[in-house]
Regions:
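Extracytoplasmic beta-strand/coil segments of soluble accessory domains associated
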Residues: 69-109, 113, 130
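Short acidic/polar hinge/loop motifs at secondary-structure boundaries
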Residues: 109-136
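Outer-membrane beta-barrel signature, preferentially recognizing the C-terminal barrel domain
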Residues: 256-276, 304, 403, 407-491, ...
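Periplasmic-side early beta-strands and strand-to-turn transitions of outer-membrane beta-barrels
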Residues: 141, 153, 160-162, 170, ...
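N-terminal periplasmic accessory domains that precede
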Residues: 68-71, 88-93, 120-125, 134, ...
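Gram-negative outer-membrane beta-barrel transporters
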Residues: 359-365, 455-459, 474-550, 568, ...
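Structural signature of Gram-negative outer-membrane beta-barrels, strongest in the C-terminal barrel
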Residues: 233, 278, 320-324, 334-336, ...
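Short, acidic, small-residue-rich periplasmic hinge/interaction motif at the N-terminus
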Residues: 24-61, 99
Length: 609
């Protein structure tokens, strides 16, 4: 879709804005400032010199998304690519970087696999998630490898107040059933959150039905999440965080069943300990462990096991009211066992330092000038030393309620264990590197309305790609630039409209676009709340044309429409109803891979103390 075709949409939106904003003031709701943990400190979103999106628990419940991948689809600057139906590998691209350039963390614990370097966002259900933080742009000075394009931090729910319990059930198309139980609260000196969920579906074919596929690929998923914490006095806190998920998927032929299958198990465990040394110095020690066991038969047994052990020691030092430091060190060991190919491991030691200067104008109640500088040194036992740095700044204009932000950063992605140790490995392959720049603004239009725009430009070199013999080589250069635009409007009568557009132009050294990444993506969401009882949502998602299979094939652009409703029948009972792909669009995100047609789901949530 060409940009000129989008111009009328933005013109109409801006004209309507002036009409609606004044009358919308009657519905003002003051919200608490949102904080972002993925920046290694509880920094308010409005102060960050980065492009950030926070998806809250309220957003998740309103959309009724079942997985993290579903809630991420259409998010600003994010491209979600599913390789088939329920349970198939789901990759996430940001700013045209490969999926191993997007770091996934669960409660601040790294979740990317050591073997392939990426994370499957379609594997994690949303039942026990409190919020999702999307930080676009390089974050390597804080997180090292895998954060070249950004970080997606999944924060699980934390208990508070009187123990509350809930039971949820949903059923719908493709013989799909979902059940979940959740309990959270505070008992004596402990706060806890516990959730378990089950998902079963007969699904649809991995191969596109409109290309002739008739069979169905069944899938089931069981997930358990647990968080237990205690404040030790007034200055210490200890938490235990555990997440376990197992999925079973049938791989079938296009027209008949067979015995192919894939079983995946994921475990993430962390034991963060926080201590306030004094009023200006906090310490956080986080040992964590991640495990993945993937067993595939298509035919023949292909089993892969990933293990990752990390110990992170972080210090937050508030030197003055205006100057703060984040510094520490991290040790990480990754192991992979491919039972038909290799066994390998790598170790990484790192030290990091980020300094923030938040200037207070004596003539203003606002801190309207922020400077930040970051440095990180990584030592990898296979390829040696690597240094990354980042400079950023933000400026706030109180008179116009406008905030500007900009940053320049370097980043890298380590070769994966597959690159270094598999049967077609290359022990001489080195890290991919990048340099990136971004500039953006956030204009508050009213209490419920704002406009966000960020321009970015990235250049990457030594990109790892397979040569003609399927051997990984540092051979490619990649260029990416784009504009991320989001407009949120608080309309009269409790309506809210959110419009977003991501334009991302990308190409390699031969001027070819990168595969499976659309140049244009548009999302529009209209929500309404009626007498605090009925929440309604109608969403439109447009994805442009994309290349596939080494630029030899293409997937066409498509438009999908969805709707979701939640009715508060009583203080204890909520009824839900949603419909997906209301236009029954026949489309593909990956060439020849199936996607769901028109479908509907209904359910309920019962809450009690």
């Amino acid at each position: 879709m060409e940009l000129r075709k989008l111009l009328p949409i933005f013109i109409i939106a801006l004209v309507l804005m002036k009409t609606f904003l004044a009358s919308a003031q009657d519905n003002i709701v003051t919200l608490a400032p949102l904080e972002v943990n993925a920046m290694r400190t509880n920094t308010q979103e409005k102060k960050l010199p980065s492009s950030v999106t926070i998806i809250t628990r309220e957003d998740i419940e309103r959309t009724q998304a079942s997985t993290v991948a579903e809630i991420l689809q259409g998010a600003l600057g994010v491209d979600v690519v599913e390789t088939g139906g329920f349970g198939h590998l789901t990759s996430v691209f940001m700013r045209a970087a490969e999926s191993n350039g997007v770091l996934a963390t669960i409660d601040g614990v790294r979740a990317n696999w050591g073997s392939a370097g990426q994370f499957d966002f379609g594997f994690i259900p949303t039942d026990n998630i409190e919020r999702i933080e999307i930080i676009r742009g390089s974050q390597s000075t804080l997180w090292g490898s895998d954060a070249m394009a950004g970080v997606i931090n999944i924060v699980t729910r934390k208990g508070k107040g009187l123990p509350t319990h809930s039971i949820s059930m949903e059923a719908g198309s493709y013989d799909t059933y979902k059940e979940s139980i959740h309990s959270s609260g505070t008992i004596k000196n402990y706060d806890y959150s516990f959730g378990v969920s089950r998902f079963d579906t007969e699904g649809f074919s991995t191969y596109s039905s409109w290309r002739g596929a008739t069979e169905r690929d069944a899938y089931d998923n069981t997930s358990l999440a647990f968080k237990l914490g205690r404040d030790i006095g007034s200055k210490k806190r200890l938490d235990f965080v555990g997440n376990w998920t197992q999925g079973n998927l049938n791989y079938d032929n296009a027209t008949s069943d067979d015995t192919d299958f894939a079983n995946d198990s994921h475990v993430h465990v962390a034991l963060p300990f926080k201590m306030a040394v004094n009023e200006r110095w906090d310490i956080k020690l986080t040992p964590s462990f991640a495990y993945r066991d993937s067993d595939t038969y298509i035919p023949g047994n292909y089993r892969n096991v990933d293990k990752s052990t990390t110990v992170d020691l972080q210090n937050n030092l508030y030197v003055t009211d205006d100057i703060s430091l984040i510094f520490g060190g991290e040790y990480r060991e990754q192991k992979a066992i491919s039972y038909n190919s290799y066994t390998g491991s790598i170790e990484n030691w790192s030290q990091y330092l980020t300094a923030n200067y938040d200037y207070q104008n004596s003539e203003s109640e606002y801190k309207n000038f922020l400077l930040t500088a970051g440095y990180r040194h990584d030592y990898h036992d296979h390829w040696g030393n690597h240094v990354t740095y980042k400079f950023g700044g933000g400026y706030y204009l109180p008179k116009t309620n406008t905030r500007f932000h900009t940053s320049y950063a370097t980043a890298f992605i380590s070769p994966t264990l597959d690159d270094l140790y598999s049967s077609s490995s290359n022990p001489n392959v080195t890290p991919e590197t990048s340099k990136s720049f971004e500039f953006g603004l956030k204009q508050n239009l009213s209490e419920r309305s704002n406009l966000n725009m960020t321009f970015f430009n990235d250049s990457r070199k030594d990109m790892i790609a397979l040569d003609g013999n399927w051997i990984p080589q540092n051979s490619e250069k990649v260029y990416s630039r784009g504009l991320e635009t989001e407009l949120k409007l608080g309309l009269p009568k409790h309506f809210n409209l959110a419009l977003s557009h991501t334009w991302n132009e990308h190409y390699d050294q031969d001027n070819r676009p990168l595969i499976r990444r659309a140049k244009n993506k548009i999302k529009a969401t209209l929500t309404h709340t009626w007498e605090k009882k009925l929440d309604s949502l109608v969403g439109l998602y447009i994805r442009g044309r994309a290349t596939d299979i080494s630029s030899l094939k293409h997937t066409g652009g498509f438009t999908t429409v969805r709707a979701a409703f939640k009715y508060k029948y009583s203080n204890n009972l909520k009824l839900t109803l949603r419909a997906e792909n209301l236009l029954d669009e026949e489309y593909e995100v990956v060439y020849a891979n199936g996607t769901p047609g028109i479908s509907g789901y209904a359910g309920f949530t019962y809450t009690f103390n």
